[in-house]
């Protein structure tokens, strides 16, 4: 009996560091063994763009010589356009990254990398965001290998509905990783103060202060896993409803007067 070949995946890759980022190129090359890889990414660095979607201006795209597609927009724009009109075929999964720098704790609220994955899930596809820890960014190949493994696992055991995975990988050789940990989001202390300066024309300008240091970073958190050289895998829900607050809110809503 002739065996039927297992259909290859069609993967959509995006990021927030821009279409020319090293992490994106390494990820695309590594995942090519799994199937067809389409890359649709911002034309420049869009870190911190969160879930912003361009609604009041047209978006220009450019087909690059390497086959990637550059979008004059945010990470969310890229994934939205790719899935709803730019790509000739629907992808099977969205992968965002590899981000240059971790997305831990409160970072996920601002991260364009996480937002790109979230947009994929909004549009009905399994999705994950992957970030490389540290500051030197030497081992993108490690993060790419981790993603390769996770995609193979997700194929066999799909993610729960309305869930994406936020993956953070230590900047280490693969053989030095201590394992995989399923984690919750930690928290940071309040951000550093805004920095006020004067421009050459005498006008005040402001720089957003640095992210605050780790606060809730104990066992079970994404911070803890990364600090102990483990890959952090945090499931994030698209549904932001705080169901545990329903009873409390219902009790005082009854006392409101119209």
From Swiss-Prot:
InterPro entries: SurE, SurE-like_Pase/nucleotidase, SurE-like_sf. The keyword Cytoplasm applies. A divalent metal cation binds at residues 16-17, 47, 99. GO terms for molecular function: 3'-nucleotidase activity; 5'-nucleotidase activity; exopolyphosphatase activity; metal ion binding; nucleotide binding. It is an enzyme of class 3 (hydrolase). Its cofactor is a divalent metal cation. Disulfide bonds: none annotated. Its EC number is 3.1.3.5. It comes from the Bacteria. It is found in: Cytoplasm. The keyword Chaperone does not apply. Keywords: Cytoplasm, Hydrolase, Metal-binding, Nucleotide-binding. It catalyses: a ribonucleoside 5'-phosphate + H2O = a ribonucleoside + phosphate. PANTHER family: 5'-NUCLEOTIDASE SURE (PTHR30457), 5'_3'-NUCLEOTIDASE SURE (PTHR30457:SF12). Nucleotidase that shows phosphatase activity on nucleoside 5'-monophosphates. This is 5'-nucleotidase SurE. It comes from Coxiella burnetii (strain RSA 493 / Nine Mile phase I).
């Amino acid at each position: 009996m002739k065996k039927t070949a297992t259909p290859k995946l069609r993967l959509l890759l995006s990021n927030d560091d821009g279409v020319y980022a090293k992490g994106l190129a390494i990820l695309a090359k590594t995942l090519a063994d799994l199937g067809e890889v389409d890359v649709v990414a911002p034309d420049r660095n869009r870190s911190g763009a969160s879930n912003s979607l361009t609604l009041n201006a047209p978006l220009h795209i450019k087909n690059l010589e390497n086959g990637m597609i550059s979008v004059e927009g945010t990470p969310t724009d890229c994934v939205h356009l790719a899935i709803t009109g730019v790509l000739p075929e629907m992808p099977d999964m969205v992968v965002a990254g590899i981000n240059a720098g971790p997305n831990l704790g409160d970072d996920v609220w601002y991260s364009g990398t996480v937002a790109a994955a979230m947009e994929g899930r909004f549009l009905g596809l399994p999705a994950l965001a992957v970030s490389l820890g540290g500051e030197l960014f030497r081992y993108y190949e490690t993060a790419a290998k981790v993603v390769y493994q996770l995609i193979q696992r997700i194929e066999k055991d799909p993610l729960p509905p309305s869930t994406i995975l936020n993956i953070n990988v230590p900047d280490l050789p693969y053989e030095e990783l201590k394992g995989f940990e399923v984690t919750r989001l930690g928290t940071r202390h309040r951000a550093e103060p805004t920095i006020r300066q004067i421009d050459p024309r005498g006008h005040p300008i402001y720089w957003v202060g640095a992210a605050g240091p780790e606060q809730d970073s104990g066992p079970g958190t994404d911070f803890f896993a990364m600090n102990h050289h483990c890959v952090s895998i945090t499931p994030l829900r698209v549904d932001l409803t705080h169901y545990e607050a329903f009873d409390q809110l219902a009790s005082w809503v009854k006392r409101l007067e119209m």
